[in-house]
Amino acid sequence: MSRYRGPRFKKIRRLGALPGLTNKRPRAGSDLRNQSRSGKKSQYRIRLEEKQKLRFHYGLTERQLLKYVRIAGKAKGSTGQVLLQLLEMRLDNILFRLGMAPTIPGARQLVNHRHILVNGRIVDIASYRCKPRDIITARDEENSRTLIQNSLDSSSHDELPKHLTLHPFQYKGLVNQIIDSKWVGLKINELLVVEYYSRQT
């Protein structure tokens, strides 16, 4: 299944706020109206919608998300929390959380078009897994810096998660540590996502 490129508002109306996909918000009460029209949700549908929420927020294909679930399942600790950490430490998501891109698809474009350096080297793979002490900067070119400045100027200036530091005048972000699950930028029940996949096998 390919990455979703359809109407974004349609997805947030059904699944709720997905800040990584779009900075738009569903109208108040729209999720309640949808639920009342469709009746009581089955447990399968609840798990499916949590999985879809995760997939659309981080802009992943079904195959990519399944791969992350399998990696998390082999790691020590809670599979759900490890899964969220893996997704949150992707380069495209780090750029989004720093405010250097308005959305995760926007961050992915910055990376794909070679506007971003990690530790002084161009990285053009959006799924690059960032680690503590990584230094993320814009290329020293006017076009790269203008794109990031536009995003910084229009960002909502929400409190940065504790694992990141931003130096806006240097177009630079620092990864201080692996993210703590309480700083994840999406309201999600990750255990339902893990349950969804465990029941598919």
Curated annotation (Swiss-Prot):
Part of the 30S ribosomal subunit. Contacts protein S5. The interaction surface between S4 and S5 is involved in control of translational fidelity. Belongs to the universal ribosomal protein uS4 family. GO terms for molecular function: rRNA binding; structural constituent of ribosome. The lineage of its organism: Eukaryota, Viridiplantae, Streptophyta, Embryophyta, Tracheophyta. The keyword Transmembrane helix does not apply. This is Small ribosomal subunit protein uS4c. Its main location: plastid. GO terms for biological process: ribosomal small subunit biogenesis; translation. Residues 89-152 form the S4 RNA-binding domain. Pfam families: Ribosomal_S4 (PF00163), S4 (PF01479). One of its GO terms (cellular component) is small ribosomal subunit. Keywords: Chloroplast, Plastid, Ribonucleoprotein, Ribosomal protein, RNA-binding, rRNA-binding. It comes from the Eukaryota. It is found in: Plastid, Chloroplast. Residues 15-43 are annotated as: Disordered. PROSITE patterns: RIBOSOMAL_S4, S4.
